[in-house]
């Protein structure tokens, strides 16, 4: 249409060809449609909580009343678990668990694997420490101790924790503190604050 109108007004053939070519290019162009993608990139994670044997959330492992004879015999053990659920976006389906002190380690030089009594009470127990183990029965089989003086991560497989719950069983055991004997143990309050750190990979 544009070409024929230009011919009637006496345009040269070379101009007509140029106009025709321009018209074809104009009609061949496509529309531009904008697209904006919006998302939030998140690190893979789980919901991890500390629970007792009744699956109730806890923040304290409570031994209740303990006798010095039980401490000396290493028979006062309390079991608990880390509970993992709603896991997503974790490539290798693994969790690394580390326990670190918030008070001191056992031993006269504070160089022991157990966690020392961090109570500030005037009537606190002396020469007592707590060990934390990676199994329900301390110091047996594949059990690994969470060391106070040299914290190291323990690995947990959480591949099924996306649709189910994964438990990591542990135990705590009261013992006579390193470099001490049962004769050094005195009755009183005991508290050993520590922090579990969980990282995923």
Curated annotation (Swiss-Prot):
Induction: Repressed by H-NS.
GO cellular component terms given for this protein: pilus
Keyword tags: Fimbrium, Signal
A Pfam family: Fimbrial
Secretion signal, residue range per the UniProt entry: 1-28
Disulphide connectivity of cysteines: none
Single GO BP term: cell adhesion involved in single-species biofilm formation
Keyword flag Signal: yes
Knocked-out gene: effects: Deletion of the operon under classical laboratory conditions does not result in any major effect on E.coli capacity to form biofilms compared with the wild-type strain.
Compartments (UniProt record): Fimbrium
Note: The operon is cryptic under classical laboratory conditions, but is functional when constitutively expressed.
NCBIfam families the record matches: PRK15263.1-1, PRK15263.1-3
Family: Belongs to the fimbrial protein family.
Function: Part of the yadCKLM-htrE-yadVN fimbrial operon. Could contribute to adhesion to various surfaces in specific environmental niches.
PANTHER family: FIMBRIAL SUBUNIT ELFA-RELATED, FIMBRIN-LIKE PROTEIN FIMI-RELATED
This protein's name: Uncharacterized fimbrial-like protein YadL
Species in which this protein is naturally found: Escherichia coli (strain K12)
Gene it is expressed from: yadL
